Structure formats: C-alpha cells, structure tokens
C-alpha cells in the first residue's frame, strides 16, 4: 500500500520543491498591482500581481517594504524581484517580494525623481565634494563590459593620446538585473588598487531603460564613496543618469571620457616647441630694437663734434649696452627656466628615464611583473633594459624584505 500523506505533509513537500528550485528562488516579474493592502500594525504589504490572462498573490514584508522609494497602488505597473513558495497552512503558492519599482517610462521617471531628491538632500551631487581630475595620469581603471564597443573606444583614444598609459579593467554587465551590483563591485575593486589614479565607468549608449543600471542607488553610492576620481561615460548626450550627477566629471561618450582622462603627449611636445620658437623670436626682437637705437645714434651729428661730446655719447652707449645685456639675460633666464620645467615634466613621464638609472622592466608573456606571486620557478621572463632585451629563466625564488615597513 502506498504511503498516505496528510495535507500538511503534502503542502510541506510542495514548499520544499519550490524552495529548492534555483529558478524560482530569484525571479524578475512585471505586472499590474491589484487589491493592494497595507497593514499599518505589521507594516506588511499584500496584493495581487496580474497581467491580461493570469494573477498571482504576493506579499512584501515590512523589512523590505520600508526600503521602497514610491507608494504602490492599484493599477500601477511594477517590476519586482521575488521568490516563489507555498503558504503551507492554506496550500497556496505566492510571491515573496524582495524588491519593487515602478515600470514604464512614467513610473521610472517618478521613481528616479524621488531617488534624486533623496540623494541630493544627502549632498551626493554637491559641487564642492567633487574631486579634481589628475593632470598627468599613468594608470586608468575602467568599469564596463569587456565585450562592449565602449571599452574599445576608450582604449583606442587613450593609446592615441598617451601611448604609455596603463589600463586596469573591472569587467561588469552594463544592463540587466545583475548590472548594478557588478558595477558597484567593480568600483570597489579598482579602489583597492593603489596604482589606479582615475576611473572611467560607462557604456556605449542605449535606450532610457538600458541605462537604468546607472541610475541604481548601489552604483551612485559606490561612486560617491570612491577615493579615486571618477569620470562617468554613459554614452548618451541628452539624458543624464544619477551616475553622471554624482561623478566627479561627466563625459557625453566613452571616447570623450578617454580624451578627458589623459594628457595629449603629442600636443605637449608641440607646445614645448612653440615655447622655444616664441623665446627665440622675443630675443631677436629685443636685439633688433637696441641695434636700431645704436644705429640711429651713430648717424647723429654728435659723432662729428669734438672729443668731449663724443665722450659723453660713449657713456650713454655704455649704459645702453649694459641695459640691453641685463634685459636679454633676464629674458633668457626666465624663458630657459620655463622651458626646463616643461621639459622635466615631459621627461619624468618616460619609462626610459628609470632604465637610465640601472632599473629594468620585467615581463611575463607581455605582462609587467609587479609581485613575486606572479612568478614561479621555471618561468621564462623577458627583461627590458636601456639598450638590450634579455630572456631569463627563474631557477630560484626567495622572498626578502628590502626595507622597513
């Protein structure tokens, strides 16, 4: 004879089946609210979610409901994240809602306006809290999809403007339910790298709904808490996201973000050449000016007068020569100082400068070695020196302490 179950046992069995199903444990649903009830004493919300053909009961407990940014009501279309389980006492399966927001352009707009007001009141968008973008960046962190056009555009412009810049990528989805958490985690990850000097976060444009991940409070919070300056590059020239408002600098496109991130080294070189030419022309003008003065003096009658008059003019000429010499020396010293400062700034950016002091660049399969954990015994490494490249094999590995912490 087959086992006979009680009603409670059957309901519990069905509940266990639903609770163990990974698909039913994390669902995103869209539907219309009907029969909405808020119990003031408990704070729990009960309603029916429906579409044109079906309905399902739903509950949102107080611990989740108090985090809502809007007031649910009948007839409102919503997007929610929930799990499916059975209320065993009644044998009724229903949704247990974890997160809910208005759906559709109108609903999203109202939701974002309320969130924007809340964040503005906390000072998230205040201009005085925004960090300055560094002038000479050597290492840029990027939070975006590794497969997107945005990453290719950013890297292309970075290499055009500054061939020596290094890129650190934190891969993330840029749309969908997982995107907000991944974007926020990418920002936190890049903040853990002390070498990263600037972060670009963004995507290659899209519809208003596609950009919703960059309106997430999770992402806004992560940008606000970043210790590293952040440039937003959502790729939409008209619509501003909340990420744009909280970022230290907003770029209309990923390409523009890359242009804002690093200095144009070719332009700097041209500027130095221009300074040199201006200095030379200024000196030539001064020399011509005083030469003409001397020539005019030489043409005057004084040179035909007795020796006493000639002596007086000789003294004047001597004074003029001294003035000319001092003036030109001062101009030359000032221009030379400016030129030296600009040349030093440019020269300090060159990796070859470090190699001149006897240092080398150690690489493994094209990647720079920064930590002994990247190297194993038997690895073949490439050594870049000032005037030669070597290939070596690791035969011994020993951790040593070079200086006191």
UniProtKB/Swiss-Prot annotation:
Residue intervals passing through the bilayer: none
Single Gene Ontology BP annotation: DNA catabolic process
Pfam families, sorted: Exonuc_VII_L (PF02601), tRNA_anti_2 (PF13742)
UniProt keyword Chaperone, yes or no: no
GO CC terms: cytoplasm; exodeoxyribonuclease VII complex
Enzyme class at the top of the EC tree: hydrolase
Location of the protein in the cell: Cytoplasm
A single GO molecular function term of this UniProt record: exodeoxyribonuclease VII activity
Keyword Transport belongs to the record: no
Reactions that this protein is recorded to catalyse: Exonucleolytic cleavage in either 5'- to 3'- or 3'- to 5'-direction to yield nucleoside 5'-phosphates
The protein's Enzyme Commission number: 3.1.11.6
Coiled-coil residue spans: none
InterPro entries tied to this protein: Exonuc_VII_L, Exonuc_VII_lsu_C, OB-fold_nuc-bd_dom
UniProt record similarity statement: Belongs to the XseA family.
Complex and partners: Heterooligomer composed of large and small subunits.
Function: Bidirectionally degrades single-stranded DNA into large acid-insoluble oligonucleotides, which are then degraded further into small acid-soluble oligonucleotides.
Protein name: Exodeoxyribonuclease 7 large subunit
Organism: Syntrophomonas wolfei subsp. wolfei (strain DSM 2245B / Goettingen)
